C-alpha cells in the first residue's frame, strides 16, 4: 500500500515555521545566561535594570489576515506615523535584526509612530565619535524630537502629551549602544508637558535573529507581522516585486530617519 508523506512534510514545515517564529519573536533574550555571555560589558547594568523594571512585550500573536488591508509598513532607516481613523491605522515593520524598533503610542489620542532605527540615527554624538564619525549634533536627539513634533501636531492639542513606548529588536554586540542612547535621549527630553512611559521590551538576541511587528492605533496592541502573508494578501498589487503597502525609505541622510508616511497633512512650519 502506498502512503503519502505529504502530511508529515507539511507538519514538519509548520513546526519549523513555528520554531523560527518563536526563536525570533517570542523568546526572552534578556535572561542572565545571555546577558553574561553576550552583552557588551559597559551596558550590562542597564540591561539588567531593563529586564527587572520593564516587562517583556509579547509579539507572537498573529495579525488577523483581513487586517493586512489596514497595514502600512516602514522599511529600514524610516519612520511612519499613524492615527486610528486613518486608511492605514496599523503600523508595521520587519527584519529588526541589528536594528531597533522604537514604537510610540499616545492612548488618549490613539496616534503613534514606529521608527526602524539602524545605526547612526540612534546614536548620541558621543557614540558617533566613538564610532569614528565627527558630528556636531546628536542624531538620536534630533530624530526623537522630530517624532515628538509630528505626534504633537497629530494630537491637535497643546495639552501635555503622555506617550507609552516600546523597544523591540537588536542583537548582542551591535545594538546595546542604540538601546542606551535612545533611552538616554528620551529621559532627557521628557518634561512637564511631555511624559514617557516605557511599557515593554523585546530586545537583543543572536545575529541570525530578526523580529517583525505591528501596532494597531485603535487599540495600542502589538502583534506579529508576517511578511509572507502580507505579500500574499496584496498578490499582484506590487511595485518592483514589493507589496504596495511597504514604504521604501529614500535614505536622504545617514543621520536622520526618513519620514515615509504621515496620515494627515502636516505643516512643517508649525
Swiss-Prot record:
GO cellular component terms given for this protein: virion component
Principal place of residence: virion
InterPro entries tied to this protein: CheD-like_sf
Record keywords: Virion
Subcellular location: Virion
Protein name, per record: Uncharacterized protein R721
Organism the protein comes from: Acanthamoeba polyphaga mimivirus
Upper classification of the organism: Viruses, Varidnaviria, Bamfordvirae, Nucleocytoviricota, Megaviricetes
Amino acid at each position: 500500500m502506498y502512503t503519502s508523506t505529504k502530511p508529515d512534510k507539511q507538519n514538519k514545515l509548520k513546526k519549523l515555521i513555528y520554531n523560527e517564529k518563536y526563536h525570533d519573536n517570542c523568546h526572552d533574550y534578556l535572561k542572565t545566561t545571555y546577558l553574561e555571555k553576550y552583552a557588551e560589558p559597559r551596558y550590562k547594568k542597564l540591561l539588567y535594570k531593563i529586564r527587572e523594571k520593564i516587562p517583556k512585550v509579547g509579539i507572537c500573536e498573529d495579525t488577523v489576515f483581513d487586517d493586512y488591508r489596514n497595514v502600512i509598513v516602514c522599511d529600514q532607516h524610516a519612520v511612519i506615523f499613524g492615527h486610528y481613523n486613518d486608511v492605514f491605522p496599523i503600523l508595521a515593520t520587519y527584519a529588526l535584526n541589528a536594528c531597533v524598533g522604537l514604537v510610540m503610542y499616545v492612548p488618549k489620542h490613539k496616534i503613534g509612530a514606529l521608527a526602524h532605527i539602524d545605526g547612526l540615527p540612534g546614536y548620541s554624538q558621543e557614540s558617533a565619535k566613538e564610532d569614528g564619525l565627527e558630528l556636531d549634533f546628536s542624531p538620536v536627539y534630533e530624530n526623537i524630537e522630530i517624532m515628538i513634533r509630528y505626534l504633537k501636531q497629530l494630537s491637535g492639542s497643546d495639552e501635555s502629551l503622555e506617550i507609552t513606548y516600546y523597544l523591540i529588536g537588536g542583537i548582542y554586540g551591535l545594538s546595546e549602544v542604540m538601546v542606551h542612547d535612545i533611552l538616554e535621549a528620551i529621559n532627557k527630553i521628557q518634561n512637564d508637558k511631555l511624559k514617557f512611559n516605557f511599557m515593554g521590551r523585546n530586545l537583543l538576541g543572536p545575529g541570525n535573529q530578526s523580529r517583525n511587528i505591528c501596532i494597531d492605533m485603535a487599540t495600542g496592541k502589538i502583534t506579529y507581522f508576517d511578511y509572507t502573508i502580507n505579500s500574499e494578501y496584496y498578490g499582484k498589487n506590487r511595485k518592483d516585486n514589493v507589496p504596495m503597502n511597504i514604504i521604501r525609505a529614500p535614505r536622504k541622510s545617514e543621520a536622520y530617519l526618513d519620514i515615509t508616511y504621515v496620515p494627515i497633512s502636516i505643516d512643517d512650519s508649525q
